């Protein structure tokens, strides 16, 4: 394999959904894992030299430090089962490469790239490097392909070469999108959203909960100060409520809460993107062709 598999005018497109999948995989990675590694799925169009990355899934891996060498072992059975499961719903998607959330290439990248070279059969695998540390306030993405180097009969190696990456997988002409934006700008009427009523409901529930907690604290203080006779039914209900809550320290609760909040925000963002894409596609389908 060589870089000739990818011509200079080859277009590699990355769907935004894949980035959200990689972010989610990084957030839900095993506790001892520093990075997330996974498989990239997509479509190859050899007629116009286009590769579109449309899907991905995380692959479980283990990292071992052997001297100065870092060895990464993938769960190949898990990767195979995930690919077969994806083929049931999306048989047109094939393995086009792999991703890693490390900040830079490592010595183990060559071994992982060799594995995906076998999975991609007659095509060169892509390697997407996504740095999620947000250095400079940006989500840095880099796309590589592997180029074998060395002399015949001697030591051989692999050199990673950067490829251009287009982060929008659309074939719609820019002028069409601009016309849609212009129409919305000239007609700024918007329907009231549902976010504010939902926030008001959350606020009302929170205030009601605070009132009940204040009432409960006053009752406990009055009983301890012998200003009120204790009620066995109330005490039994309090005991059952307290014992039903798992005991955990403040740091564990904070991590669990933040993880759940991230999941909710990712779900909301993804659903909003899908809704916007559907609305935009519907608008574009009704535009006249010029």
Curated annotation (Swiss-Prot):
Transmembrane segments: none annotated. One of its GO terms (molecular function) is translation initiation factor activity. Keywords: Cytoplasm, Initiation factor, Protein biosynthesis. Pfam families: JAB (PF01398), MitMem_reg (PF13012). Its main location: cytoplasm. Residues 12-150 form the MPN domain. One of its GO terms (biological process) is formation of cytoplasmic translation initiation complex. It is found in: Cytoplasm. One of its GO terms (cellular component) is eukaryotic 43S preinitiation complex. Component of the eukaryotic translation initiation factor 3 (eIF-3) complex, which is involved in protein synthesis of a specialized repertoire of mRNAs and, together with other initiation factors, stimulates binding of mRNA and methionyl-tRNAi to the 40S ribosome. The eIF-3 complex specifically targets and initiates translation of a subset of mRNAs involved in cell proliferation. Belongs to the eIF-3 subunit F family. Component of the eukaryotic translation initiation factor 3 (eIF-3) complex. The eIF-3 complex interacts with pix. This is Eukaryotic translation initiation factor 3 subunit F-2. It comes from Drosophila grimshawi. The lineage of its organism: Eukaryota, Metazoa, Ecdysozoa, Arthropoda, Hexapoda. The gene is eIF3f2.
